[in-house]
A protein has these predicted regions:
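Short acidic, glycine-rich loop/turn motifs
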Residues: 28, 72-74, 98
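A short, polar/proline- and glycine-enriched secondary-structure boundary/capping micro-motif
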Residues: 45-47, 81-82, 116-120
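Short, conserved beta-strand element in jelly-roll/cupin
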Residues: 53-70
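Short acidic-glycine-tyrosine-enriched beta hairpin
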Residues: 74-91
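Ligand-binding loop in jelly-roll beta-barrel domains
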Residues: 89-120
Length: 128
């Protein structure tokens, strides 16, 4: 059964008015399996400022609703859409267009040690 990890929304978050993330997850054999809900307008870059604005760990995943733009440190971008399987190496951030008609929802797999450490830092940036 998936368990809530944390939720960040406008009342918790200092970064942007439309920052709305819900995350559920579970540990399986040293891997974290997390389901993310990113509302339209979500930009995770401000939450990654401790890491230079880019996520320091790789993720594997599947997008089952909506779409998101993944931006890499080298300036390249790719759009992940519903039905896409993806791999995001370390050095990425993501943005959901504020005019998107639906939220972006993904399931993502990450090394538990890396994921837990990174998510703890990001969660500390949320308002209490």
């Amino acid at each position: 059964m998936r368990k809530p990890i944390y939720e960040m929304n406008p009342k918790h978050n200092p970064f942007t008015e439309n920052f709305d993330i819900k995350i559920w997850g579970e540990l399986h054999g040293g891997m974290e399996c997390a389901v993310y809900h990113f509302a339209p307008g979500t930009d995770v870059t401000p939450g990654l400022q401790t890491f230079g604005g880019f996520c320091p760990i790789p993720h594997w995943g599947y997008c089952f609703k909506g779409e998101m733009t993944v931006r890499y440190e080298d300036g390249k971008e790719e759009v992940i859409r519903a039905g896409d399987v993806f791999y995001s190496p370390k050095g990425h951030t993501l943005i959901v267009d504020k005019n998107a008609p639906v939220a972006c929802e993904i399931i993502e797999f990450s090394n538990m040690a890396d994921f837990g450490e990174t998510e703890a830092v990001v969660a500390k940036t949320a308002k209490k």
